[in-house]
């Protein structure tokens, strides 16, 4: 958005039949998280032509057994366009009995000339409320506590639990 204090509409962009979250990436690209068709996908679009958006990259993360809380809580998604990294909260359930097998987040890099690359993942206790970075560190706040780690070693997050 070239002028965030004075936004203006540029038209209607039809990208999916499901729920979709849009994240601007420069002037003419967007990254989307899409749960249409019982699948969770991340996509990158060139929207320089508003009437003809071009899908640049798409990655399916899983079927109906994987979900993301970004549709209910957009603050759970962290996107650092300067470092070309985003963090997406995910929950994976067993297809057999519906029990949660993974609750946490995936970390991706994105480059418009190369696509997406999953850099790692970290698990959390509780539902992710927000993810942010400060001074090169990655922080994740859930309804049960706060964790801190690095983008290079997300599986080594350490945290403290909130006391009730």
Show where each model-derived region lies.
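Feature marking well-ordered beta-strand scaffolds used for ligand recognition
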Residues: 1-164
């Amino acid at each position: 958005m070239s002028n965030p204090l004075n936004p203006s509409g540029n038209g209607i962009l039809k990208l999916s039949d499901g729920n979709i979250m849009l994240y601007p990436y420069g002037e003419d690209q967007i990254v989307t998280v899409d749960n249409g068709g019982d699948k969770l996908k991340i996509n990158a679009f060139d929207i320089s032509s508003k009437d003809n958006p071009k899908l640049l990259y798409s990655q399916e993360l899983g079927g109906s057994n994987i979900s993301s809380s970004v549709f209910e809580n957009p603050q759970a998604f962290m996107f650092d366009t300067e470092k070309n990294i985003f963090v997406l909260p995910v929950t994976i359930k067993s297809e057999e009995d519906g029990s949660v097998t993974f609750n946490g987040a995936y970390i991706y890099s994105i480059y418009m000339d190369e696509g997406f690359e999953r850099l790692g993942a970290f698990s959390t206790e509780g539902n992710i409320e927000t993810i942010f970075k400060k001074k090169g560190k990655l922080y994740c706040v859930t309804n049960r506590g706060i964790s801190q780690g690095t983008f290079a070693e997300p599986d080594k997050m350490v945290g403290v639990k909130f006391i009730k």
